């Protein structure tokens, strides 16, 4: 289900948080289209945190610490990376207004980024919204093989350590399905969301001012 919003200027970060609490999120048709529309899928993508899967090859990459993983160090760099064209994706739903809104959410502590670095360069990452014990994954990107996958592994470890209950991926792709993503009907999703909004989670349960090793991230995931 979608609804058009012709008055995008009226949407504030606070309005956006209320929308997430109701199970809806904004998108744009393209980077050049200033119009936003609200989306509430009939089938919602989630990754059950207790059922997160890491393939053995990826686990070796994570454990090797070939990448350096940080949190909230370069939020604008991550959202710009997500907005840039990538192989198989020539256009983006992240327009200027979307970018401004999520930078605003980041400024008030409700939107976080995970950055993956290689030799000092931003090689990939992801960002998403945190509300209660729910985390809403918005977008990810990579410039080096496995960089976005490594970001997701570190995100899940952080969510598990911080007491989160719901990882919302909005939609399910084959890529996300390999990690255990599933689709749930709208009504079931709303119930899961309501439960997750009742408590408080800590995105900073793991250090945010220094990198967490891949071995530590995998240890946390294995314990759940």
Curated annotation (Swiss-Prot):
EC number, UniProt record: 2.3.2.6
Major localization listed first in the record, in broad terms: cytoplasm
Reaction(s) catalysed by this chain's protein: N-terminal L-lysyl-[protein] + L-leucyl-tRNA(Leu) = N-terminal L-leucyl-L-lysyl-[protein] + tRNA(Leu) + H(+); N-terminal L-arginyl-[protein] + L-leucyl-tRNA(Leu) = N-terminal L-leucyl-L-arginyl-[protein] + tRNA(Leu) + H(+); L-phenylalanyl-tRNA(Phe) + an N-terminal L-alpha-aminoacyl-[protein] = an N-terminal L-phenylalanyl-L-alpha-aminoacyl-[protein] + tRNA(Phe)
Pfam short name (any one): Leu_Phe_trans
Compartments in which it is found: Cytoplasm
This protein's record includes keyword Transmembrane helix: no
GO terms for MF: leucyl-tRNA--protein transferase activity
GO cellular component: cytoplasm
Cited function: Functions in the N-end rule pathway of protein degradation where it conjugates Leu, Phe and, less efficiently, Met from aminoacyl-tRNAs to the N-termini of proteins containing an N-terminal arginine or lysine.
PANTHER family: LEUCYL/PHENYLALANYL-TRNA--PROTEIN TRANSFERASE, LEUCYL_PHENYLALANYL-TRNA--PROTEIN TRANSFERASE
Listed NCBIfam families: aat
Family membership noted in the UniProt record: Belongs to the L/F-transferase family.
Protein name: Leucyl/phenylalanyl-tRNA--protein transferase
Species of provenance: Rhodopseudomonas palustris (strain HaA2)
């Amino acid at each position: 289900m979608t609804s058009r919003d012709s008055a995008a200027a009226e949407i504030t970060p606070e309005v956006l948080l209320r929308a997430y609490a109701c199970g809806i999120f904004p998108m744009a048709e393209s980077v050049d289209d200033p119009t936003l529309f609200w989306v509430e899928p009939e089938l919602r993508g989630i990754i059950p945190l207790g059922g997160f899967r890491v393939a053995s090859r990826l686990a070796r990459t994570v454990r090797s610490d070939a990448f350096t993983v940080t949190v909230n160090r370069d939020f604008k760099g991550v959202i710009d990376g997500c907005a840039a064209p990538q192989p198989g994706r020539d256009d983006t739903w992240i327009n200027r207004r979307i970018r401004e809104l999520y930078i605003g959410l980041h400024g008030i502590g409700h939107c976080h980024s995970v950055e993956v670095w290689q030799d000092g360069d931003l090689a990939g990452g992801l960002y998403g919204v945190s509300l209660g014990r729910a985390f809403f994954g918005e977008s990810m990107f990579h410039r080096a093989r496995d960089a976005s996958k490594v970001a997701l592994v570190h995100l899940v470890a952080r969510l598990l350590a911080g007491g989160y209950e719901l990882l919302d991926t909005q939609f399910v792709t084959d890529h996300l399905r390999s990690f255990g993503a599933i689709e749930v009907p709208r009504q079931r999703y709303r119930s899961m969301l309501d439960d997750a909004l009742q408590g408080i989670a800590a995105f900073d349960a793991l250090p945010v001012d220094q990198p967490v090793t891949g071995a530590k991230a995998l240890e946390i995931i294995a314990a759940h």
